[in-house]
Amino acid sequence: DIDVHDWRLGPTEVEQHRVPVTSAVRTWLDIARLRPLSDGLAVGDALLRSRVGISAEIRTSIDARGSIRGIRRARLAADHIDGARETPLESGSWAYFVEHRVALPAMQHEIRSRDGRFVGRVDFWWRHAGVVGECDGRLKYTDRADLYAEKRREDALRELGFTVVRWGWQDLRGEALAQRLRRVLA
């Protein structure tokens, strides 16, 4: 799909080295304003992982735009971008939590056994409820050895008394995942 939008570009946003471009921040801002929150978070999270100090540039860019269409959505995305999320599915999951008012978890949390042995690093961690959240794409465990290792890791988490909730892209549609999370977080 191609979306065409008319919005004036600044001189550094139009051309660099004789190639027509928009800056990384400008591109993010357009995505954050005009696309779903999950898209703005996925691109923003990647920007934060790739460039130190970009967060201030993002805020300055938003503030300079005043009240253009979609700016509130961009502000919401800016409030939630975080370089700790490592995949678009993790970013999409965070957007889902925000949109469905699910309690926001810690991210990329290390879990250790009672004797201090490393058990694993989990995508999402709701400490107050002892709940681990794992989001998995279809291609994550195509190798049998990886699948078996993940099963053993999940068994170890459950043996420590944690509830493990898993989801994929398809679960980010509708209310079922939010209801399931609210139930285990209560």
Residue ranges of predicted features:
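Basic, glycine-rich
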Residues: 110-119, 126-186
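Phosphate-handling catalytic interfaces
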Residues: 1-106
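Surface-exposed beta-strand edges and their flanking turn/coil or helix-capping segments
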Residues: 1-4, 15-20, 89, 120-121, ...
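Conserved active-site beta-strand-loop modules that form the wall/rim of enzyme catalytic pockets
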Residues: 93-96, 100-109, 120-124, 130-132
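Short acidic, glycine/proline-enriched helix-loop-strand junctions
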Residues: 66-67, 75, 117-119, 124-126
